[in-house]
Amino acid sequence: MSKVGNGDAKNTLYCSFCGKSQHEVRKLIAGPTVFICDECVELCMDIIREENKSSLVKSRDGIPTPKEICKVLDDYVIGQNHAKKVLSVAVHNHYKRLNHQTKHSDVELAKSNILLIGPTGSGKTLLAQTLARILDVPFTMADATTLTEAGYVGEDVENIILKLLQAADYNVERAQRGIVYIDEIDKISRKSDNPSITRDVSGEGVQQALLKIMEGTVASVPPQGGRKHPQQEFLQVDTTNILFICGGAFSGLEKIISARGRSTSIGFAAQVLAPEDRRTGEIFRHVEPEDLLKYGLIPEFVGRLPVVATLEDLDENSLKKILTEPKNALVKQYQRLFEMENIELTFADEALGAVSRKAIERKTGARGLRSILESILLETMFDLPGLEGVEEVVISREVVEGTARPLYIYADRSDRAVESSASA
């Protein structure tokens, strides 16, 4: 412990690592002859997390086991255990196959691209983004809605490989071992049952264009984008070893699956189920290739996505966990924002339940949680920077429902001061 000056200053405690005083930090933890502040503890945790992440990637000759991959996914994604297992096994097998393909073998191992099917806000994109964090391979995400056939206004399919090449710093060898996630894949379904009616440049045409790069071909990729720089030299990228993960909400697919599985009996023996009796995620579990064909995917495209993983609807309990449990949980993010004003933000358990129910009513899944919290905390975040002495803000169920204002607890008072007992 260092001391400066006379009077009260000699009793001031300082962090032994960064030198900040006890008045400059939120917490100062004492040990035998040393002190450490909360900021240094958080910095140490970040260092440890980075080391754990690198040790995961380098384990078992560079191939993380499926359980190790799934364990890291658990830190960020709540639920969806089946989808996490499918992704973990597929990624593990993908790189195991690459590491052993140079060895002599009579059996050639083909790659297994993945199709993720799940309702809006169930975690498809988050699973792919989390994989990018934990794997030391080039990774890129593409939006299928922006893709068109070559020669039409929009992005060429080859632009996906260009983005992967950019993620690999134009290292062709690394890019050829990368992962591509194509989102909104359901939006390129065939627009008509009769393919000869009109030229479908953003639907079936894109599916046809994706076939070759997903199966494996040598793509000629212009470094600066082909349409604006037609005279440049092309880079040759072999897509045989690139793993493709496609995801989509497939709105309406549940009706096709239900119609296929519906009993054809009539009269008193017929079983009549209301649509709301079965949740979308439960119906998706029974998806078959024929259902995807009826939805508008062409047979060749379905054949190149042999692994299908379905995601469940998120119930109230799962949404509450999403709000609080992941490392980057929304509640933790807003609490961190309030900490910057030296204010503690507290959510009552009933308030979290009310937020979850609102998201379910809006049918936005986990994606809608942030907008709900933003609307709840808007007035508070607007007022707080100009208020003095506020120590804690408490959010109750009534606040979420719009019948009350947040509770403000002041440092110089033992009771809770409320801006207004109820909103007008």
Curated annotation (Swiss-Prot):
GO terms for molecular function: ATP binding; ATP hydrolysis activity; ATP-dependent protein folding chaperone; protein dimerization activity; unfolded protein binding; zinc ion binding. PROSITE patterns: CLPX_ZB. InterPro entries: AAA+_ATPase, ATP-dep_Clp_protease_ClpX, ATPase_AAA_core, Clp_ATPase_C, Clp_protease_ATP-bd_su_ClpX, ClpX_bact, P-loop_NTPase, Znf_CppX_C4. Zn(2+) binds at C15, C18, C37, C40. ATP binds at P119, T120, G121, S122, G123, K124, T125, L126. Residues 3-56 form the ClpX-type ZB domain. One of its GO terms (biological process) is cell division. Keywords: ATP-binding, Chaperone, Metal-binding, Nucleotide-binding, Zinc. Pfam families: AAA_2, ClpB_D2-small, zf-C4_ClpX. GO terms for cellular component: HslUV protease complex. SMART domains: AAA, ClpB_D2-small, zf-C4_ClpX. It comes from the Bacteria. Component of the ClpX-ClpP complex. Forms a hexameric ring that, in the presence of ATP, binds to fourteen ClpP subunits assembled into a disk-like structure with a central cavity, resembling the structure of eukaryotic proteasomes. ATP-dependent specificity component of the Clp protease. It directs the protease to specific substrates. Can perform chaperone functions in the absence of ClpP. Belongs to the ClpX chaperone family. This is ATP-dependent Clp protease ATP-binding subunit ClpX. It comes from Bradyrhizobium sp. (strain ORS 278). The gene is clpX.
